[in-house]
Amino acid sequence: MAKSIIFSEEARRALEHGMDILAEAVAVTLGPKGRNVVLEKKFGAPQIINDGVTIAKEIELEDHIENTGVSLIRQAASKTNDTAGDGTTTATVLAHAMVKEGLKNVAAGANPIALKRGIDKAVKFLVDKIAEHARPVEDSKAIAQVAAISAGNDEEVGRMIAEAMDKVGREGVISLEEGKSMTTELEVTEGMRFDKGYISPYFVTDTERMEAVLENPYILITDKKITLVQDLVPVLEQVARAGRPLLIIAEDIEKEALATLVVNKLRGVLSVVAVKAPGFGDRRKAMLEDIAILTGGEVISEERGLKLENARLDSFGTARRVTVTKDNTTIVAEGNEAAVKARCEQIRRQIEETDSTYDKEKLQERLAKLSGGVAVIKVGAATETEMKDRKLRLEDAINATKAAVEEGIVPGGGTTLAHLIPVVTEWAQANLSGDELVGANLVARALGAPLRRIAENAGQNGSIVLERVKDKPFNTGYDAQNDAFVDMFEAGIVDPAKVTRSALQNAASIAGMVLTTEAIVVDKPEPKTNTPASSGSGMSDYDY
């Protein structure tokens, strides 16, 4: 396909125009009085949302060159979302402001490479300053405040996430599910839960709730498929003599062996439940090992020289209680604290070493399950459209609270960045010169953009609000919800330091890339061909 090549000022202006469109669509959602954006969907109802990165992902322009600008600024939002899970709108607004300021300087003859160096140095200085001003999150009240702000000033959501974090601990997993009712509910699971249920409904002990509950059972853990009854008979005899229930976790159980278990269960010879092993491949082996450590048992595997027919009771795990439903198995074990602690430490090291986001997520899940912390928030809403919006807000709120726990909190509502304007300006004057100084100053001017936009979305004059905030102490900012200047920590208007830092770093990275762009190579649009059908052939005016 033929390519179109555009150079220098024309190239930068085309990128800028694409960025203007995306930044405006995203910026309208910023702050407590930000508006919503409606996204048309090819299938199903339109989506009404308030989430910067979701809006950014939807925007595709007809002009290929402008669309390149959209893709660049979208990266600032996406990368911030990946790193901190929130702050995507702030990152977009900051990147846009830096590009606008920078292009003026490039047009006036500044050296783009020196500008970028100045931007990078200023951002490094600002990141250190943000860390200096961050306060650690010490109680669930602070967690509730962060979550409420991130969920669009929804205090009920803030309280719920704080409660969930309180119960599952800071390493616990808080997951979201679509609820069946109008209200949003929190469900906390005690013990380790994995998403495999009983193989046969004949194992059920409570027919009303359709679940099997085993008190103080033995747990047989194996990574092989059980096909022969002969393999199981010695195991069943030992457990029957001990007079305790049995949970079997295996790759699969073939019909003949399964029938034997069901018959024993129905005759009352043995209380038994069989479930399939969770996960796949290497992850399955690791999860079975986790279950074995939690329950004080061994994984019976031929790789380790252990055979099922030779298995003895002392290689089985034990638990206080096991509950098995159609879809899930929950094991509540006690004791083995030292072994579990060592295993958790090992998983933590793996989390630090891995580069894959997916692997990190799965390892984090395993860590949470081992330390007994999984909370599920069931999102309720009147309509599907509202449900999707609430789910996105809750996702942001959960990510924001985790970020706050990691790096602490700073005054929210664009306040921190606004107060750092005079600080970075003074530092730049003392340490930089020439175009590097110009680069640092353009960062300083861009820092006021989020606060200015929050005020404008609340119907105020953004520049006046910004100047008034800059004259006040560091913790004082603008409360757009109540149109007042308040101590942001006391008012509970706080942002995670990690979110503010990530938004600034990613915005500066994209701005630096755009300013140092000298040429754009894009596909030439294909010429539109006129179809003969449309010219007087008696066809109707409608497109089909």
Curated annotation (Swiss-Prot):
Q: Which family does it belong to?
A: Belongs to the chaperonin (HSP60) family.
Q: Name one GO biological process term.
A: protein refolding
What is the recorded name of this protein? Chaperonin GroEL 1
List locations, semicolon-separated.
Cytoplasm
A GO cellular component term found in this entry reads: cytoplasm
Q: Which reaction does it catalyse?
A: ATP + H2O + a folded polypeptide = ADP + phosphate + an unfolded polypeptide
Where along this sequence does the record place binding of ATP?
29-32, 86-90, 413, 495
Any one GO molecular function term = ATP binding
Give EC number(s), comma-separated: 5.6.1.7
Q: Where is the composition biased (Polar residues)?
A: 528-538
**Originating species:** Synechococcus sp. (strain JA-2-3B'a(2-13))
